Curated annotation (Swiss-Prot):
It is found in: Cytoplasm. The gene is efp. Belongs to the elongation factor P family. One of its GO terms (biological process) is peptide biosynthetic process. This is Elongation factor P.
Length: 186
């Protein structure tokens, strides 16, 4: 069981015969009246997002989510193929389930496949990825004082904002949780 007062981002639990993941939460303690927990929840089966308020003492059964390392192989139309790194078994997953989570993942990278009772509902990419910049405007010496950014296309085709000193061919580290530039690796 999980208590609503212990909610954190990413916690999964069962409620009304559905499985929800906490996307945002806020503990509210008004000057008058009882405290409550305001949440934004994602139904991991349907993908719908709902807002719900809980009493901090409300208890829900925790959903047991399986996370399995699999290698992203390739995509063919609306199907993405992954391979179990232990059994070499291939698993096709449709684009609706994946969403935009593979924007920063290259073929042959290892990702975590999320499932509940055998039903795949999502993918968790590595927290940080290192990708090569394939196209961006050239940077000029002395252009870094303002902290300005420019668009850059990385090798997966995703466009990200980078500092002006980043050039085509540079390897950059990106945080996949926020899809933001972290640093230049080389």
């Amino acid at each position: 069981m999980i208590v609503a007062g212990d909610f954190k981002n990413g916690v999964t639990f069962e409620l009304d015969n559905n499985i929800f993941q906490v996307v945002e939460f806020q503990h509210v303690k008004p000057g008058k009246g009882a405290a409550f927990v305001r949440t934004k929840l994602k139904n991991i089966i349907t993908g719908a997002t709902v807002e719900r308020t809980f009493n901090p003492t409300d208890k829900m059964p925790k959903a047991h989510i399986e996370r399995k390392d699999m290698q992203y192989l390739y995509n063919d139309g609306d199907l993405y193929y992954f391979m179990d790194v232990e059994s070499y078994e291939q698993l096709p997953i449709n684009k609706e389930t994946i969403g935009n989570t593979l924007d920063l993942v290259k073929e042959n990278d290892i990702v975590k496949i999320l499932s509940h009772k055998g039903n795949v509902f999502g993918i968790e990419p590595p927290t940080f990825v290192e990708l090569e910049v394939t196209e961006t405007d050239p940077g000029f010496k002395g252009d870094t004082a303002t902290g300005a950014t420019k668009p850059a296309t990385v090798e997966t085709g995703y466009v990200i904002k980078v500092p002006l000193f980043v050039n085509t061919g540079d390897i950059i580290r990106i945080d996949t949780r926020t899809n933001e530039y972290m640093e230049r690796v080389k």
